[in-house]
């Protein structure tokens, strides 16, 4: 199960349910947009318990609509009769202008739509942040890892000698 994080004590409704941490390593994110997501009742209750994974999922524009494909929402134990499919396609809610921008972005070579974070906003509504991303090459990933390691070493040195 995913760990549920809360952003602040003043806002009890805001909760990060699932985060795609690998996306920032594998992709160069150009821009991101907050989208609504159409869910069934048992899916919402399962998300509130923290049972979701968006690491293997992606978003796609099909027939003038935006879909979240291959995202996992764990089954809700108390829903016996009206259980949801764990890996079904879920429709994302977005304005027409943003949809056309996404369509144009995915038509460029190497661009894809990657889910970054799934959360409940301050009003308690389930939202997902979708990023327009370009896949990194192996040498770019190595460069990112080297920068991250160097910043860790710098902070350790400053802590030891500071």
UniProtKB/Swiss-Prot annotation:
Entry-linked Pfam families: SmpB (PF01668)
Could you list this entry's UniProt keywords, alphabetically sorted: Cytoplasm, RNA-binding
- Subcellular localization, as worded in the UniProt entry: Cytoplasm
- Region feature Disordered, mapped onto this chain: 140-162
| GO terms, molecular function | RNA binding
Coiled-coil intervals, chain numbering: none
Q: Mind telling me which GO cellular component terms the entry cites?
A: cytosol
Matching InterPro entries, A to Z? SmpB, SsrA-bd_prot, SsrA-bd_prot_CS
Signal peptide range: none
Q: Which GO terms describe its biological process?
A: trans-translation
Q: Which family does it belong to?
A: Belongs to the SmpB family.
Q: What is its biological role?
A: Required for rescue of stalled ribosomes mediated by trans-translation. Binds to transfer-messenger RNA (tmRNA), required for stable association of tmRNA with ribosomes. tmRNA and SmpB together mimic tRNA shape, replacing the anticodon stem-loop with SmpB. tmRNA is encoded by the ssrA gene; the 2 termini fold to resemble tRNA(Ala) and it encodes a 'tag peptide', a short internal open reading frame. During trans-translation Ala-aminoacylated tmRNA acts like a tRNA, entering the A-site of stalled ribosomes, displacing the stalled mRNA.
Protein name, entry field: SsrA-binding protein
Protein source organism: Roseobacter denitrificans (strain ATCC 33942 / OCh 114)
Gene encoding this chain? smpB
